[in-house]
Amino acid sequence: MTRITARPLTREAFAPFGDVIDMGGDNHYPINGGKAERYHDLATAEATGPNARVLISMVRGTPYELPLKLTMVERHPFGSQAFIPLSPRPFLVVVCHDGKEGPGEPYAFITAPGQGINYSRNLWHGVLTPLGEPQDFLIVDRGGDGSNLEEFHFSHAYEIHLP
């Protein structure tokens, strides 16, 4: 089993895979008479294909045992997929570049409390992986006609460890 250690999630490290959603950066400004601060344009939701539309959903995820035994990844060919935690707890993010015959070697990240992610359209990624206790998330992804899910099962498992 190949061992992979998760590293901290940063905008720079995650850029090839999608967007980090947090209140960092300088693209923010006051709204509502100065009573609120808007952090603007943090990610791009993408929805393509027949009758495509952007959906907003919620999910309650159950934590996995660590180290995580990664045997499968998935991707969504018609749209991006964002996971925004509704509590200030970290979660595990696993992604892979596209290879010649499926996904390449996985990369693992651990979010800082309050960070969310937006997977690019057609990106191989692991399943939602809360840490320690159940966690609620807001999901922004694609609805419409056609199957927007492909799964790939690795011939050998990867073992994902926290730092």
Swiss-Prot record:
<dbReference type="Pfam" id="PF04115">
    <property type="entry name" value="Ureidogly_lyase"/>
</dbReference>
<dbReference type="InterPro" id="IPR011051">
    <property type="entry name" value="RmlC_Cupin_sf"/>
</dbReference>
<comment type="function">
    <text>Catalyzes the catabolism of the allantoin degradation intermediate (S)-ureidoglycolate, generating urea and glyoxylate. Involved in the utilization of allantoin as nitrogen source.</text>
</comment>
<comment type="pathway">
    <text>Nitrogen metabolism; (S)-allantoin degradation.</text>
</comment>
<dbReference type="GO" id="GO:0000256">
    <property type="term" value="P:allantoin catabolic process"/>
</dbReference>
<keyword id="KW-0456">Lyase</keyword>
<dbReference type="InterPro" id="IPR047233">
    <property type="entry name" value="UAH_cupin"/>
</dbReference>
<dbReference type="GO" id="GO:0006145">
    <property type="term" value="P:purine nucleobase catabolic process"/>
</dbReference>
<comment type="similarity">
    <text>Belongs to the ureidoglycolate lyase family.</text>
</comment>
<dbReference type="InterPro" id="IPR023525">
    <property type="entry name" value="Ureidogly_lyase_bac"/>
</dbReference>
<keyword id="KW-0659">Purine metabolism</keyword>
<dbReference type="InterPro" id="IPR007247">
    <property type="entry name" value="Ureidogly_lyase"/>
</dbReference>
<dbReference type="GO" id="GO:0050385">
    <property type="term" value="F:ureidoglycolate lyase activity"/>
</dbReference>
<dbReference type="InterPro" id="IPR024060">
    <property type="entry name" value="Ureidoglycolate_lyase_dom_sf"/>
</dbReference>
<protein>
    <recommendedName>
        <fullName>Ureidoglycolate lyase</fullName>
        <ecNumber>4.3.2.3</ecNumber>
    </recommendedName>
</protein>
<comment type="subunit">
    <text>Homodimer.</text>
</comment>
<dbReference type="GO" id="GO:0004848">
    <property type="term" value="F:ureidoglycolate hydrolase activity"/>
</dbReference>
